[in-house]
């Protein structure tokens, strides 16, 4: 099969910044408490009238420009999100229309914080098998719109943003080398938004009970995350015929400093190889990894031939990792 790699990246976050000091005025918390437990100092918040499709569109423009690809050349658009503009139509359809990707197929994919990894793994198969040539994968979220701003256990954690990647055939032996994806529905209730679906359709009661906001069993999710991040990264590396010593760059889901630090320690990887930006953005769910990827690529942390691992976990419960031999050459 054809080797498939990332040939362009882009990201976008809203202008408005919400700091920990701002949160002190909203809920019973303080900057020191938030930083010591999460590592987060600030996050970006979309305006009430701004849908996730706008963030996805802006990230997509930047990724296409980086890849030197015109929108009409796209064959496939995948949007990973838990905060779509609508239940239907898919946000991918809205973004593709605005871009002018007239010949592209497209759909939304929902795997919470693991969504971008599921997205690139899916898109890569369409290209590897020769069905498509150019794919755009976007992870975007407006989590601020589904937060209970009175719940200090969750409202301090999340932010809004979008990241995108363009996938194409690349030279043999480069690009995606291995994946590991998984899920465990038994843990679905640990991280969920219960209202609005066919189980609990929207009603005055579901709104009053704040069922349209993120509900999280923090300690249970923490224990799961620390264990699974290391396991899935090692499995993906094994499938690629590599070990942790071969890794030049690790891009973990930016959920919480303590989770990232614990996973890094378990893996035994040099902390200097790990990309961390959650202090500036918080947890952006499906946007977390692609925004960090874009920053790593643009800052020179990824060089031609580097072995890069993206790894994450999320609601579902879901998890995943992808191993990439970086195929993009510097300008």
UniProtKB/Swiss-Prot annotation:
Sequence segments annotated as region (ACP-binding): 254-258
CDD domains for this protein: KAS_III
GO molecular function, one term: beta-ketoacyl-acyl-carrier-protein synthase III activity
Entry GO terms, CC: cytoplasm
Main subcellular localisation: cytoplasm
Catalytic activity, reaction form: malonyl-[ACP] + acetyl-CoA + H(+) = 3-oxobutanoyl-[ACP] + CO2 + CoA
Localization (cell): Cytoplasm
Biological process according to GO: fatty acid biosynthetic process; secondary metabolite biosynthetic process
EC number: 2.3.1.180
Active site: 113, 253, 283
Pathway terms, separated by semicolons: Lipid metabolism; fatty acid biosynthesis
Signal peptide annotation: none
First-level EC class: transferase
Keyword annotations: Acyltransferase, Cytoplasm, Fatty acid biosynthesis, Fatty acid metabolism, Lipid biosynthesis, Lipid metabolism, Multifunctional enzyme, Transferase
Keyword Cell membrane: no
NCBIfam families, alphabetized: fabH, PRK09352.1
Written domain comment of the UniProt record: The last Arg residue of the ACP-binding site is essential for the weak association between ACP/AcpP and FabH.
Function: Catalyzes the condensation reaction of fatty acid synthesis by the addition to an acyl acceptor of two carbons from malonyl-ACP. Catalyzes the first condensation reaction which initiates fatty acid synthesis and may therefore play a role in governing the total rate of fatty acid production. Possesses both acetoacetyl-ACP synthase and acetyl transacylase activities. Its substrate specificity determines the biosynthesis of branched-chain and/or straight-chain of fatty acids.
UniProt record similarity statement: Belongs to the thiolase-like superfamily. FabH family.
Subunit structure: Homodimer.
Matching PANTHER family: 3-OXOACYL-[ACYL-CARRIER-PROTEIN] SYNTHASE 3, BETA-KETOACYL-[ACYL-CARRIER-PROTEIN] SYNTHASE III
Name of this protein: Beta-ketoacyl-[acyl-carrier-protein] synthase III
Organism: Desulfitobacterium hafniense (strain DSM 10664 / DCB-2)
């Amino acid at each position: 099969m054809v080797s498939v790699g990332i040939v362009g990246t882009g990201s976008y976050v809203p202008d408005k910044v919400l700091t920990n000091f701002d949160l002190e005025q909203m809920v019973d918390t303080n900057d020191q408490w938030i930083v010591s437990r999460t590592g987060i100092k600030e996050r970006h918040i979309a305006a009430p009238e701004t849908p996730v499709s706008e963030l996805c569109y802006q990230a997509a423009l930047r990724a296409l420009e980086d890849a030197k690809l015109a929108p009409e050349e796209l064959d496939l658009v995948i949007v990973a999100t838990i905060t779509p503009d609508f239940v239907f139509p898919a946000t991918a359809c809205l973004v593709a229309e605005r871009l002018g990707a007239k010949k592209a197929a497209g759909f939304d994919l929902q795997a919470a914080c693991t969504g971008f990894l599921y997205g690139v793994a899916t898109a890569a198969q369409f290209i590897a098998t020769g069905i498509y040539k150019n794919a755009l994968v976007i992870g975007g979220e407006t989590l601020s719109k589904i937060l209970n701003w009175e719940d200090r256990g969750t409202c301090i954690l999340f932010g809004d943003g979008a990241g995108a990647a363009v996938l194409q055939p690349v030279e043999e032996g480069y690009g995606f080398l291995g994946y590991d994806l998984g899920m465990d529905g038994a843990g679905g209730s640990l991280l969920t938004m219960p209202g609005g679906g066919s189980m609990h359709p929207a009603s005055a009661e579901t709104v009053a009970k704040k069922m349209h906001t993120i509900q999280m069993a923090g300690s249970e999710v923490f224990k799961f995350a620390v264990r699974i991040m290391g396991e899935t990264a090692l499995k993906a590396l094994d499938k690629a015929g590599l070990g942790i010593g071969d890794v030049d760059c690790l891009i973990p889901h930016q959920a919480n400093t303590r989770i990232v630090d614990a996973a890094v320690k378990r893996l035994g990887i040099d902390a200097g190889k790990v990309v961390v930006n959650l202090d500036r953005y918080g947890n952006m769910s499906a946007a977390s990894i692609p925004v960090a990827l874009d920053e790593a690529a643009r800052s020179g942390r990824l060089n031609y031939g580097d072995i890069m691992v993206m790894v994450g976990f999320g609601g579902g419960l879901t998890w995943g990792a992808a191993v990439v031999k970086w195929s993009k050459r510097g300008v």
